Curated annotation (Swiss-Prot):
Cofactor note: Binds 1 nickel ion per subunit.
Pfam families membership: NikR_C, RHH_1
One of the protein's GO biological processes: response to nickel cation
CDD domains: RHH_NikR_HicB-like
Cofactor(s) required, per the database record: Ni(2+)
Species, as recorded: Chlorobaculum tepidum (strain ATCC 49652 / DSM 12025 / NBRC 103806 / TLS)
SUPFAM superfamilies registered for this protein in UniProt: ACT-like, Ribbon-helix-helix
Amino acids binding Ni(2+): 78, 89, 91, 97
Protein name as it appears in the record: Putative nickel-responsive regulator
One GO MF term: DNA binding
Domain of life of the source: Bacteria
Length: 134
């Protein structure tokens, strides 16, 4: 027995034509694949807004020569240790580092961690990417 369900939807011609162009540009094999992704994205937005369980990555670049920055980064990560699964540290050059922090937990808490890191002087760029944890 299949877990897939079929259903029909009605859309205006302009909307479906625009959607078909999007599907082609993104390289989807079918409308169904594209719709599944859109539904997942919307459900993730809802989960995040409601403070649900999410997983993701915080990716940041920073200047490790900035005074006390490395110690502040470590302190903040320890303050949120229950959310952090792992970290990967990459030396980009003599001054710049890339850090990838894998996270899992309550969406608002992960956003607090991300914000606490982002505002530190010496952090050049930070991006938070979240996904469903289930």
């Amino acid at each position: 027995m299949s877990d897939l369900y079929r259903f029909g939807i009605s859309l205006e011609r302009k909307l479906i034509e625009s959607f078909d162009r999007h599907i082609k540009a993104q390289g989807y094999q079918s409308r169904s694949e594209a719709l599944r992704d859109l539904i997942r994205e919307e459900l993730l937005r809802k989960t995040t807004a409601e403070g649900g369980l999410v997983a993701g990555a915080i990716v940041m670049t920073y200047d490790h020569h900035k005074r006390d920055l490395v110690n502040r980064l470590i302190d903040i990560q320890h303050d949120f240790h229950d959310l952090i699964i792992s970290t990967q540290h990459v030396h980009l050059d003599h001054e710049n580092c890339l850090e990838v922090i894998a996270v899992k937990g309550n969406a608002p808490e992960i956003e607090k961690l991300s914000s606490a890191l982002k505002v530190l002087v010496g952090v050049k760029h930070l991006d938070l990417s979240l996904s469903s944890a289930d």
